[in-house]
From Swiss-Prot:
The lineage of its organism: Bacteria, Pseudomonadati, Pseudomonadota, Gammaproteobacteria, Pseudomonadales. SUPFAM superfamilies: 6-phosphogluconate dehydrogenase C-terminal domain-like, NAD(P)-binding Rossmann-fold domains. Catalyzes the NAD(+)-dependent oxidation of L-carnitine to 3-dehydrocarnitine. GO terms for molecular function: carnitine 3-dehydrogenase activity; NAD+ binding. The keyword NAD applies. This is L-carnitine dehydrogenase. Its EC number is 1.1.1.108. It comes from Pseudomonas putida (strain ATCC 47054 / DSM 6125 / CFBP 8728 / NCIMB 11950 / KT2440). HAMAP family: L_carnitine_dehydrog.
């Protein structure tokens, strides 16, 4: 069955931080958006989040016809998905909830509409088990803020068709995203597994009194983080090998991997560790509100994205290279 890839109506189920990010991105790309969330006050909170994201999206550039007025909030799942060309679910990470939700979504949706889930911790084969037409169901795992960061990890379940993966790539690309197909259905996918390893080490460093949260963040943002934003890990280490490249790097520094520098198990989240982390991040935040920090993050991300795009273009590369 051919799947819909030219999207006019985008359905969003769940309107928290991630769901509202999808809504803002879809609206900015000139789509009609139908949203549903059963939580009290959800519509008001969603419209506020979209309004907060809009200045950054205006700076990035809106598609013709893009408007916050093209958002419609509805009372039922069926009304949300019935006429949608694409569906993105961003509900809480509970298997029982997602099983029930996707049974209802898939029963009411067009049979050729791709259904994506924003899950970061559940596997698609599990929560799409009771879905109608499971061959069109994928994970589309984004990163916050969804309306600015381009990466989306696409994961298929045991019954997802290859055609659905390709259709999802096309849809997410049209939304200005950089789709990354995760070849195997594994917990944590790709990016979160890397981030969790770094997070565990950071917690150990705080717990052992080696560094404060601010010092750890400085180690990233003034060091490797700058390189990671445009080269990633492997290409960075290729340069560390000199003219001989990665093979020399592996032979020279590979044995260091066996040194007992790092921990694999996470530290126990004691009250003291939690207090130390909260105290440290509160000091970093200072008098700035969360809203002010979000504006700072968005403006800086826009500048970084534009700088990376411009520099790549000068070297004959596209942004996604």
């Amino acid at each position: 069955m051919p799947f819909i890839t030219e999207i006019k109506t985008f359905a969003a189920l769940g309107s928290g931080v991630i769901g509202s990010g999808w809504v803002a991105r879809a609206l900015a790309h000139g789509l009609d958006v139908v949203a549903w969330d059963p939580a009290p006050g959800a519509e008001q909170a969603l419209r506020k989040r979209v309004a907060n994201a809009w200045p950054a999206l205006e700076k990035q550039g809106l598609a013709p016809g893009a408007s916050q007025d093209r958002l419609k909030f509805v009372a039922t799942i069926e009304e949300c998905v019935r006429n949608a060309d694409f569906i993105q679910e961003s509900a809480p990470e509970r298997l029982d909830l997602k099983l029930d939700l996707h049974a209802k979504i898939s029963a009411a949706a067009k049979p050729d509409a791709i259904i994506g889930s924003s899950t970061s911790g559940l596997l698609p084969s599990e929560f799409y088990e009771s879905s109608t037409h499971p061959e069109r169901c994928v994970v589309g795992h984004p990163f916050n803020p969804v309306y600015l960061l381009p990466l989306v990890e696409i994961v298929g379940g045991s019954r997802t068709s290859p055609e659905a993966i390709e259709a999802a790539k096309t849809i997410y690309t049209a939304l200005g995203m950089r789709p990354l197909h995760v070849r195997k259905e594994v917990p944590g996918f790709i990016a979160d597994r890397l981030l969790e390893a770094l997070w565990r080490e950071a917690l150990h460093l705080v717990n052992d009194g080696v560094a404060t949260t601010g010092e750890i963040d400085d180690a990233i943002r003034f060091g490797a983080g700058l390189r990671w934003s445009f080269m990633g890990t492997f290409l960075t280490y290729t340069l560390a090998g000199g003219d001989a490249g990665m093979r020399h790097f592996m032979s020279q520094f590979g044995p260091a991997l066996k040194l007992p520098w790092t921990y694999l198990p996470a530290p126990e989240l004691t009250d003291k560790l939690i207090d130390d982390v909260v105290s440290g991040t509160s000091e970093q935040q200072g008098e700035r509100s969360i809203a002010a920090l979000e504006r700072y993050r968005d403006d800086t991300l826009l500048a970084v994205l534009e700088a990376v795009k411009s520099s790549k273009a000068s070297h004959g590369l596209s942004f996604s290279d």
